[in-house]
């Protein structure tokens, strides 16, 4: 792309920050709000679902989901997300970002409501219905990853691009807090309206019939914020970079951007800016071409592997916070509480950890990513996560002893803080900045799907890996013997350390245009 062809894209890169940028953050971020809300809430309500559907008459302890059912409920949404990331990433490059953007949000709205309406004559059929709708919910959420990241990167100016993409991702923080607030609020209402004794006092009465409505209402509420932004998402124009570079309609690109951004672009300037009307010395290369491998092969290896390793560590802990809290004594023993009391205590504990550790990390990234840079934040985040996991694992017996649990929780919260002020944010941001426009959503989708493979490994593997190595103790929970929580933390520390090393494959996009990073601005390059 010759220098005089860069006029329009340079105008977008240098455009001042304005109100539409913030509007786009909210519109694009609703998918991540729903993603985090669903992930947070499903880890809460699985305990309640176990009590409602799997408590046997005469049992000495409250019911819980069988291992295979728990793995399916927790993991099926990840399988859907992975599939959606690959499909909608490819489709976003094929037919345009805007063309499919509304489809993902509509899927989230419908399937969030449908998850709460899961039906069946037996517990197995209810769980099968829930898993079906959670797969398609994940499919819609997955599509939002490459589309939202790509749209925000192509709207933003290069000076604050990292902060804008990070802010979209940081909507997960609001989703987490909303999940906690909704769960606490609904549970508090039902507890006061339908008081129940602890399981130890009266097993049957400890789970009132109305508890079956609680988990359904919590899951369904996730559809509301997405529904409120659907209209505005459908009104968003296609990005200028896609329209001019990929769709070859420079005049439309100029008109669209002039409507929403305070950038004056004439049709003549847009035509000059479109690289499609100029001869190139080489043909456009595809994803599986040798030219792509030469230019971006190591980049793709870096973005996929670091996201994979981050999500193994992140989701292994995030999905099962409630079990860790119970193990260290932060949540009372299940049989000393009613079903709604247990949900209330778990929701309160997880919300406190999110408020103190998880959510602030997102906004530290927003504030500092365009100052410090992506590479430094990601490398430092992986390194500090490794250190904190080792600090949890080495003296694990000390942390689980009576009186020391608060120290464990503080280190645990700091681990999440540096995950979010670190690789959890940067692995999402960088793939939207370093690949060519015609492959940008596809490559982001591939990177994100790799991350979800890690989440699947974490969500399925941690159920078994963290079980006690003593067969009798593991069997009491319905699992085969594992390696224990302590050794699992050592394994997760190893994943974080490897992520730190592989970060060196990822380039630094701070302060550079998208065309500079993808090398689309080079003379003779497509």
Curated annotation (Swiss-Prot):
Pfam families: Sugar_tr
Main location: membrane
Ranges that cross the membrane: 25-45, 71-91, 100-120, 123-143, 164-184, 212-232, 297-315, 352-372, 375-395, 408-430, 446-466, 489-509
CDD domains per the UniProt record, alphabetical: MFS_PhT (cd17364)
SUPFAM superfamilies: MFS general substrate transporter (SSF103473)
Extracellular side: 46-70, 121-122, 185-211, 316-351, 396-407, 467-488
Chain's role: High-affinity transporter for external inorganic phosphate.
Organism annotation: Oryza sativa subsp. japonica (Rice)
GO biological processes: phosphate ion transport
Keywords for the protein's UniProt record, in alphabetical order: Membrane, Phosphate transport, Symport, Transmembrane, Transmembrane helix, Transport
Taxon lineage: Eukaryota, Viridiplantae, Streptophyta, Embryophyta, Tracheophyta
Induction info: In roots by phosphate starvation.
This protein's GO CC annotations: membrane
MF (Gene Ontology): phosphate transmembrane transporter activity; symporter activity
Misc. comment: Although related to the sugar transporter family, it does not transport sugars.
Protein name: Probable inorganic phosphate transporter 1-7
Bilayer topology term: Multi-pass membrane protein
Subcellular location(s) per record: Membrane
Family per record: Belongs to the major facilitator superfamily. Phosphate:H(+) symporter (TC 2.A.1.9) family.
All ranges on the Cytoplasmic side of the membrane: 1-24, 92-99, 144-163, 233-296, 373-374, 431-445, 510-526
């Amino acid at each position: 792309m010759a220098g005089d062809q860069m006029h329009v894209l340079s105008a977008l890169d240098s455009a001042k920050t304005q109100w539409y940028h913030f509007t786009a953050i909210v519109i694009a971020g609703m998918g991540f709000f729903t993603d985090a809300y669903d992930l947070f809430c499903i880890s809460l309500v699985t305990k309640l679902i176990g009590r409602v559907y799997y408590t046997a008459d005469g049992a000495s302890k409250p019911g819980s989901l069988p291992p295979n059912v728990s793995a399916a409920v927790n993991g099926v949404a990840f399988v859907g997300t992975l599939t959606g990331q690959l499909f909608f990433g490819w489709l976003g490059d094929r037919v345009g970002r805007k063309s499919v953007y509304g489809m993902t949000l509509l899927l989230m709205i419908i399937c969030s409501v449908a998850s709460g309406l899961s039906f069946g004559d037996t517990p197995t059929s209810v769980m099968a219905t829930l898993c079906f709708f959670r797969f398609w919910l994940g499919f819609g959420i997955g599509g939002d990853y490459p589309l939202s990241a790509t749209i925000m990167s192509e709207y933003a100016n290069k000076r604050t691009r990292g902060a804008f993409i990070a802010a979209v991702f940081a909507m997960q923080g609001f989703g987490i807090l909303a999940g906690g607030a909704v769960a606490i609020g609904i549970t508090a209402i039902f507890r006061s309206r339908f008081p129940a004794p602890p399981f130890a006092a009266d097993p049957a009465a400890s789970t009132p019939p109305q508890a079956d409505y609680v988990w359904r209402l919590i899951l369904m509420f996730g559809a509301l914020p997405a529904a409120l932004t659907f209209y505005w998402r459908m009104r968003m124009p296609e990005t200028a970079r896609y329209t001019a570079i990929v769709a070859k309609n420079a005049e439309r690109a100029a008109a669209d951007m002039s409507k929403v951004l305070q950038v004056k672009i004439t049709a003549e300037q847009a035509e000059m800016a479109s690289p499609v009307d100029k001869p190139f010395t080489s043909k456009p290369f595809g994803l599986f071409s040798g030219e792509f491998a030469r230019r971006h092969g190591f980049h793709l290896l870096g973005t996929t592997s670091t996201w994979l390793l981050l999500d193994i560590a992140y989701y292994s802990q995030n999905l099962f916070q409630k079990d860790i809290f119970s193990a260290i004594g932060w949540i009372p023993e299940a049989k000393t509480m009613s079903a709604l009391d247990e949900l209330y205590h778990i929701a309160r504990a997880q919300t406190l950890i999110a408020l103190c550790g998880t959510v602030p990390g997102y906004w530290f990234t927003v504030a500092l990513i365009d100052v410090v840079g992506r590479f430094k934040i990601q490398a430092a985040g992986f390194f500090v996560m490794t250190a904190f996991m080792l600090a949890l694992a080495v003296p694990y017996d000390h942390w689980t002893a009576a009186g020391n649990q608060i120290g464990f929780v503080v280190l645990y919260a700091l681990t999440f803080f540096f995950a979010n002020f670190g690789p959890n944010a940067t692995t999402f941001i960088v793939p939207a900045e370093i690949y060519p426009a015609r492959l940008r959503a596809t490559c982001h989708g591939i990177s994100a799907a790799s991350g979800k493979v890690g989440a699947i490994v974490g969500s399925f593997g941690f159920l078994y890996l963290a079980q006690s190595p003593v067969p009798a103790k593991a069997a009491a929970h319905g699992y085969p013997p594992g390696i224990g929580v302590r050794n699992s933390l050592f394994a997760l520390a190893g994943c974080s350390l490897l992520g730190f090393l592989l970060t060196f494959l990822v380039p630094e996009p701070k302060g550079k245009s998208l065309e500079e990073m993808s090398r689309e601005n080079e003379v003779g390059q497509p």
